[in-house]
């Protein structure tokens, strides 16, 4: 059994659907202290490393711990979690009709520390303004990197994908299973 050090319901569902036994411990972290001027793969790796360090200071040495974090990058702009609907709209407008990448960093602390950064790139059609408005009103974007839900709102607009869907949802399951 592993311990998912994350409050993400999407990551928990990914593990459950993959048949991986786990327990979940909430792990809150303020990403704003990590510089977004870094390349996205470095940024997300720094976030997950810092999250791991803070968790271990607060909870002591546990084993079989899984830490993960994701960010969305559109062009040279890193998109974290939107603070409000206006910021979510700005992030989604960057994605509409464009190519964006989701970077997910994972650290698994078992017998050894294993680190992985994965990337999935999507090309999206233009988003419908009415559907975008409904999505924003639903609040489903809250707590999601780039306000993106690849399994719901963004899904119907995908015109191409390079990489694993699970990476875009917060865990690269193919790599994680190899870790285990």
Please annotate each region the language model reported.
Residues 1-20:
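N-terminal beta1-alpha1 ligand-phosphate binding loop
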Residues 22-33:
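A short beta-strand-loop structural module common to alpha/beta enzyme folds
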Residues 10, 30-32, 114:
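Surface-exposed, flexible loop/turn segments at secondary-structure boundaries
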Residues 2, 38-180:
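Anionic-ligand binding patches
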Residues 7, 27, 111:
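Cofactor-binding loop segments of dinucleotide-utilizing enzymes, especially the Rossmann-like FAD-
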């Amino acid at each position: 059994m592993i311990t998912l050090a994350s409050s993400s319901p999407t990551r928990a569902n990914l593990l459950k659907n993959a048949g991986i036994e786990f327990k979940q411990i909430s792990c809150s972290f303020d990403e704003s202290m990590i510089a977004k001027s870094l390349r996205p793969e470095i940024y997300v790796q720094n976030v997950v490393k810092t999250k791991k360090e803070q968790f271990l200071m607060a909870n002591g040495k546990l084993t079989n711990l899984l830490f993960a974090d994701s960010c969305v990058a559109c062009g040279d702009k890193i998109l974290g979690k939107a603070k409000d609907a206006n910021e979510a709209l700005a992030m989604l407008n960057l994605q509409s009709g464009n190519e964006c990448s989701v970077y997910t960093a994972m650290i698994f602390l078992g017998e050894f520390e294993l680190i992985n950064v994965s990337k999935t790139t999507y090309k999206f059609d233009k988003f419908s303004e009415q559907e975008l408005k409904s999505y924003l009103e639903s609040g489903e974007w809250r707590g999601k990197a780039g306000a993106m839900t690849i399994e719901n709102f963004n899904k119907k607009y995908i015109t191409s994908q390079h990489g694993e869907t699970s990476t875009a949802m917060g865990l690269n399951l193919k790599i994680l299973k190899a870790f285990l």
